[in-house]
Amino acid sequence: MTIKDARTPASTQNTAQADTAENTDTAEDTEAGKSIGWHKAYVEGSRPDLRVPVRQVHLTNGQSVTLYDTSGPYTDPLVDTDVRRGLAPLRENWIIARGDTEEYAGRPVRPEDDGIKHTSPRGGLRNLDAVFPGRPRQPRRGRDGNAVTQLAYARRGEITPEMEYVAVRENVSPEVVREEIAAGRAVLPANINHPEIEPMIIGKRFLVKVNANIGNSAVTSSIEEEVDKMTWATRWGADTVMDLSTGRNIHTTREWVLRNSPVPIGTVPLYQALEKVDGRAEELTWEIYKDTVIEQAEQGVDYMTVHAGVRLPYVPLTANRKTGIVSRGGSIMAAWCLAHHKESFLYENFEELCEILAAYDVTYSLGDGLRPGSIADANDEAQFAELRTLGELNRIAKRCSVQTMIEGPGHVPMHKIKENIDLQQEICDEAPFYTLGPLTTDVAPAYDHITSGIGAAMIAWWGTAMLCYVTPKEHLGLPNRDDVKTGVITYKIAAHAADLAKGHPGAQEWDDALSDARFEFRWEDQFNLALDPDTAREFHDETLPAEPAKTAHFCSMCGPKFCSMKISQSITEQFGGTAAAGATAEEVAAGMLQKSKEFAESGNRVYLPLAD
C-alpha cells in the first residue's frame, strides 16, 4: 500500500466537490482557522476507490509522522465542503455492488418525528432551512429479509471493502478484522443508509475509540449548533458521535448531522419515542418504539442504544441506592414497567428488533440503564443483574447476525474498576465494552472530565474498546463547543495511554517522535505533534511570544541555565552516545565547564538556528 498526498489529485469520491480547491503545501485547518504543520494524505488499498485518510505531520528534521485521522473531508484542501450539500457517499458503490439490498419508498416524515403536533410551526432553525436540501435519496434495506451486516459477511468468510478500510487504519491484516467481527469481539458500525462514513472498528484488539455526545434539549441549542459540534468533535479526534437530542426538531437535526458526518452516528431511539407521547413514559408502546427505530434506521443511524436489560424484577434492586436510577433511558423504562407492572416491551420484543436492525446493519449498543450514578452504588446487584441480561441479549443478537457492543458504567472507584471489565468480558462473551468514564470520585463538578478520564484510561487498558467522553459540564449543563473539545482531548489522552499500555502497533511511534522533538528543542514539531497543537502553541507563547523563542534551547519553566534537557544534550555531545553512560563525575564536570566556556566564547547566544 502506498500513501498519496492530498496535494495531488483528490480521491475519486471527492473530485465532485473539489471545484474550487487549490493545491497547497500545507493543509489549511478550516475548523481551527490556522495553517498548521500537517496535511491530509491517503493510503491506497487494493482497489482504486479504497483510499484511507491519514494525517501526516511534517517535521523540521525532514521526517514525517503518520497519524490516524477522524476529521473527514473537512481538513482536505481539495474538498469544497458545504453542510447544505452533505458529504460524498464514499461507500455507496460498495453497498450496491454486493447486490443484497434494495431501495424502497420508506416511511413518510411526520410532524411528530420532530416533536411537532399536527400543523404547529417549526422553530429554532436559525440560519438553516428546516429540511435538509442535499441530494434526494431513498432508503435501502436488505433484500428478501437478508441480514446485510458486517457480522453476516464476516461469518461467511468475506472481507468487505469496509473491513479492508479499517485494517489499513489500524495497521493490521484484513483477516484479523474479519476474525474479530465474526467472533463478536469487534463491531464495524456502518448502516447501509449512511454511505458517507469513513469505516472504523471498535474492539479490544484495535485502537481504543472515543465517542462524543451532542444533541439539543428542550432548553437550548439549534440544528446549526449541533452540526457544528459534530464537525468540531471529529476535528479533535472523536471516532463516533451520539446525537442525544431531546428537544424539538429531533428528526431534522439528525438528518443534517448524518448527511455531514464522516464518523458513525449513534442514538437512543427511546428519547425520540418519548417525545412522540409528550414525555409520558406510561404511554409508550412497542409500536411507537418500533416505528421510531425504523425511522432512524432509514435515515442512516449506525448504532442504537437499547435499554432492553432494564427488567421489571430489577427495579426494586435500586430502591436502597444513594442515587437511584440515573440513566435517562433506564428511568424511562423503569417508569413504564412500574406503570403497567409488566415486563419491558424492549425485552419481550428483542428478537423482532434484531430482525429490523439486521436489515439495515444497525449495531446494538446494549444500554446500561441501571448503571451506578455515584461511587457508593458501584458494582451493586442491580448493575450486575442487568449485565447478566445484556449477556443473554448479546447471544440472541449474534444469532440474528446483528453486531453488538455492551455499555458500561458510570461512577466506579478505582479499586472496583477491574471487576467491571472482567465480568463484562466473561458474561458477554468478549463483546466490545463501551463505557462512560467511569468517574472515579463524585467530589469534582466542573472537573468530571478529569475524574472520569482517570477511570477511562484504566478500564481501556484492561480491555474496554470505546470510551464515551465526559465534558466539564457533566452534571451541570449542556456542553458548548469549547466543552466538546475539552472532553474529546481528555478522552483521546486516556485512549492513547491505554493503546500504549496494550502495545498497539505504532502507538509509541507518536510519543517517540514528540520526545525527540522535545529533547532537540524543535518547538514547532512539538506543537504540531501534540493532540492539541493550538493550545500547546498558545501556552508556550504566553511567556515567550517572540519568534526567536521557537529556536531557543529552553522554555519559561526553567530558563536557559536550568534546562535539564539542554544539560543532558551537552553531556551527550561531549561524550557521545553510550560512552556517556560510563562517564565519571569528574569527566561530566569537565564537560560542563568546557560547554560553559563555549557558551561564553560564542557571545552568550541563547538562540540558535535550526539545523538544515
UniProtKB/Swiss-Prot annotation:
Residues 12-24 have a biased composition (Low complexity). Transmembrane segments: none annotated. Its EC number is 4.1.99.17. Residues 105-117 have a biased composition (Basic and acidic residues). GO terms for molecular function: 4 iron, 4 sulfur cluster binding; carbon-carbon lyase activity; zinc ion binding. Zn(2+) binds at residues 411, 475. Keywords: 4Fe-4S, Iron, Iron-sulfur, Lyase, Metal-binding, S-adenosyl-L-methionine, Thiamine biosynthesis, Zinc. GO terms for biological process: thiamine biosynthetic process; thiamine diphosphate biosynthetic process. It comes from the Bacteria. This is Phosphomethylpyrimidine synthase. The lineage of its organism: Bacteria, Bacillati, Actinomycetota, Actinomycetes, Kitasatosporales.
